[in-house]
């Protein structure tokens, strides 16, 4: 089934009859293309993954378990990976609302982006209470409802810590049981869903015992408001403490971490989290392009209409380009030169590099235009277009 069958016109809602017919067609195609017809395919750097194949071709899987289904939308063969040791399969490329939703782009473009993401096989949409002070979640929720995406076909996340208001009061931020609970309820309302598939502690909270946070997350899971909880930018020691508390008290342990990961920022995932990932921790990584640095767009300076040039993003510009990381731009330029020599888009090559890590469950993409998103999705094809010698050159360019 081509993507247009679900969203033949993104500007017009479907009728119930059309939606039901499309759902039935998908179900029939899925039954016809189970792993009993699949060809096994070896793929370096990919674990627990299901590759989508064209509807008119034989489906194939990469390290997939028995009974998994392969399918494809449009020209991109989306890859699906298990979230760590859970049974949840996320699209290897996901879509996030950081910086853009509720701030840089309008509702119409947000609608086009989510529709394009869905049509190309993305099933995980990432968000947080702090993004545009809650407006990003509101816009995403409105768009998903407007597009009438089937709730059992996608996953949505939120993150808690920073708060969703300017100058938050003490109980409006952090990881206390109160704020973890209040923020969850607010996210559910803004996103127009009855539960969050993934719920992250956006940062560690030095003012709240980890035990209290673990208990709060476990309570939300038992209430059916959250399916999996995790962390973002916690230290390995803090994660191990949370896991130990959960095991000791028979609570739900964190299932995933959301760290920054790219060619210029790799130590935490590859070294600090290594043993945790081996034990089954999933990761949904952010900033695969180092806030655009690895695309080459900042090689000649920061344009006013770029992400780093947006009003209020001076802190991000300082972090990406400024001291003590001044050498980052030099390394990014070297990477872009290698990409050109390999005949690859720098953005696609950088994202594909992230996908080669078997401990990466999903790479969160950000985009302000559909053309950006579609280019980034091409990273799935880049995986097969670069040989070992080429990847070695990529590695050496950023060391």
Protein language model features and the residues they cover:
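N-terminal small/glycine-rich loop or linker at the start of catalytic domains
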Residues: 85-101, 157-171, 195, 200
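Short, acidic/polar
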Residues: 105-117, 175-191, 239-244
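N-terminal binding-site loop/beta-alpha segment at the start of enzyme catalytic domains
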Residues: 60, 65, 69-154, 222
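Active-site mouth loops of central-metabolism enzymes
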Residues: 97-108, 166-179, 202-203, 207-208
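Conserved beta-strand positions
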Residues: 95, 127, 158, 198-201, ...
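Intrinsically disordered, low-complexity, charge-rich segments with an acidic bias
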Residues: 7-26, 38
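Active-site groove signature of glycoside hydrolases
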Residues: 188-208
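Beta/alpha (TIM)-barrel catalytic core signal, keyed to glycine-rich beta->alpha loops juxtaposed to Asp/Glu
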Residues: 208-398
């Amino acid at each position: 089934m081509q993507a247009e069958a679900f969203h033949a016109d993104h500007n017009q809602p479907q009728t119930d009859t059309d939606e039901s017919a499309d759902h039935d067609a998908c179900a029939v195609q899925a039954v016809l293309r189970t792993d009993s017809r699949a060809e096994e395919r070896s793929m370096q750097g990919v674990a627990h993954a299901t590759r989508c194949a064209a509807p008119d071709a034989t489906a194939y899987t990469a390290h997939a378990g028995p009974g998994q289904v392969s399918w494809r939308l449009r020209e991109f063969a989306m890859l699906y990976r298990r979230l760590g040791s859970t049974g949840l399969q996320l699209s290897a490329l996901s879509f996030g609302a950081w910086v853009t939703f509720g701030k840089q782009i309008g509702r119409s473009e947000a609608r086009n982006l989510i529709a394009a993401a869905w049509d190309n096989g993305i099933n995980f949409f990432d968000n947080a209470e702090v993004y545009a002070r809650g407006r990003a979640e509101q816009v995403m929720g409105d768009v998903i409802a407007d597009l009438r995406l089937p709730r059992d076909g996608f996953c949505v996340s939120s993150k808690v810590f920073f708060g969703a208001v300017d100058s938050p009061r003490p109980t409006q931020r952090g990881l206390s049981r109160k704020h973890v609970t209040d923020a969850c309820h607010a996210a559910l309302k803004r996103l127009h869903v009855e539960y969050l598939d993934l719920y992250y502690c956006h940062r560690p909270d030095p003012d709240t015992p980890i035990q209290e946070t673990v208990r709060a997350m476990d309570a939300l899971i038992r209430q059916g408001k959250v399916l999996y909880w995790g962390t973002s930018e916690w230290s390995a020691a803090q994660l191990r403490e949370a896991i130990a508390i959960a095991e000791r008290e028979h609570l739900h342990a964190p299932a995933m971490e959301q760290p920054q990961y790219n060619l210029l920022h790799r130590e935490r995932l590859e070294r600090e989290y290594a043993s945790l990932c081996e034990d089954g921790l999933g990761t949904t990584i952010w900033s695969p392009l180092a806030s655009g640095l690895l695309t080459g767009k900042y090689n000649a300076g920061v344009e006013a209409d770029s992400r780093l040039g947006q009003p209020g993003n001076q802190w991000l510009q300082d972090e990406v380009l400024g001291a003590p990381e001044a050498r980052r731009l030099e390394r990014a330029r070297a990477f872009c030169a290698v990409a050109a020599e390999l005949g690859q888009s720098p953005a696609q090559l950088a994202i594909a590099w992230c996908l080669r890590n078997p401990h990466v469950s999903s790479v969160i993409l950000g985009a302000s235009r559909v053309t950006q998103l579609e280019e980034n999705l091409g990273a799935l094809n880049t995986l097969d277009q670069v040989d070992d010698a080429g990847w070695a050159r990529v590695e050496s360019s950023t060391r």
